[in-house]
């Protein structure tokens, strides 16, 4: 049975009882382990379209132990890449052998390669790339890994899990961060109109946005205060850059895989902070002054839903 994303949404809206928000991330999937040597090979194979120099740098990162891989007592949780001008980037991870860990390694190495190319091309004043483009290189690697896994995986259940992982990336990065940005704007609008910013008023703003963005499912009141634990709101309008960065990365990866040409993207990686972010992205083939990039990403989102529906329905 073939079903489109529009038909799937229509069915979700018609469900009795209504699909609830808290069930959104529940799924059945096979337990697949990803040991570190296998993950390293996956990341290398997925990024082959980026060329020989990129591959050699990945080899260096692994051989010279740029990555602090495993969990340890007293170690900070999560993962991040730290660029160090004049040396090489360092990556902190807490690798536990899951699919998500494989994507995290690809993601953080994307940051590291961006730092390396910028640091070795630009002077100290211009080496540091800006927040606007910070998540592009990391997400390009995630998209390339997704596409490689889908190309090589034959088990339908595993393919479904990979597709769902990709869709969740869209939801949490493109849609959810845009929701956050709209919430932030509405909070400023309330203040400008002389309205008091109380927990009650901000909860209502957030609830209404959740109901708008996720109109196909039931919204629980427990989600209303979610805004209060988002630290990014202390940096004005930080969050929308996740959505623009993700959209840009999807467009760049699609271009590389379709044309085989990564030259513009590789040049973009060298620019650091030497130009305005919008101008740097144009070098990689992305023009965020036009809607095409976001529309292209949303088209990939629709196509991914259609592909998942063919497996599940």
Where are the regions that the model predicts?
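Divalent metal-coordination and catalytic microenvironments
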Residues: 26, 107, 138, 183, ...
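Short beta-alpha connecting loops at secondary-structure transitions
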Residues: 90-94, 122-131, 162-169, 188-190, ...
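Post-HExxH zinc-binding segment in Zn-dependent metallohydrolases
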Residues: 118, 129-158, 166-168, 172, ...
């Amino acid at each position: 049975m073939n079903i489109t994303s529009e038909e799937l949404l229509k069915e979700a809206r018609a469900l009795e009882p209504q699909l609830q928000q808290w069930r959104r991330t529940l799924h059945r999937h096979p337990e697949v382990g990803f040991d570190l040597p296998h993950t390293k090979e996956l990341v290398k194979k997925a990024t082959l379209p980026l060329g020989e120099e990129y591959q050699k740098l990945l080899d260096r990162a692994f051989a010279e132990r740029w990555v602090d891989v495993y969990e340890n007592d007293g170690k900070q949780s999560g993962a991040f890449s730290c660029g160090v001008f004049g040396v090489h980037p360092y990556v902190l991870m807490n690798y536990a052998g899951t699919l998500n860990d494989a994507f995290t390694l690809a993601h953080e190495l994307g940051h590291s390669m961006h730092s390396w190319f910028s640091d070795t091309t630009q002077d100290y004043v211009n080496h540091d790339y800006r927040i606007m483009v910070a998540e592009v290189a990391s997400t390009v690697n995630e998209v390339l890994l997704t596409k490689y896994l889908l190309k090589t995986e034959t088990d339908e259940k595993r393919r479904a899990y990979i597709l769902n992982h990709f869709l969740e990336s869209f939801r949490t990065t493109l849609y959810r961060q845009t929701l956050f940005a709209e919430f932030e704007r509405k909070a400023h609008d309330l203040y400008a109109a002389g309205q008091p910013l109380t927990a009650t008023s901000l909860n209502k703003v957030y609830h209404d946005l959740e109901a708008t963005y996720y109109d196909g499912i039931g919204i629980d009141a427990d989600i209303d205060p979610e805004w209060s634990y988002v630290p990014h709101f202390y940096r004005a309008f930080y969050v929308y850059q996740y959505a623009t960065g993700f959209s840009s990365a999807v467009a760049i990866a699609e271009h590389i895989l379709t044309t085989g040409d990564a030259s513009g993207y590789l040049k973009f990686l060298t620019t650091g902070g030497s130009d305005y972010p919008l101008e740097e992205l144009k070098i990689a083939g992305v023009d965020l002054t036009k809607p095409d990039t976001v529309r292209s990403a949303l088209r990939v989102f629709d196509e991914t839903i259609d592909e998942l529906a063919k497996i599940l329905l």
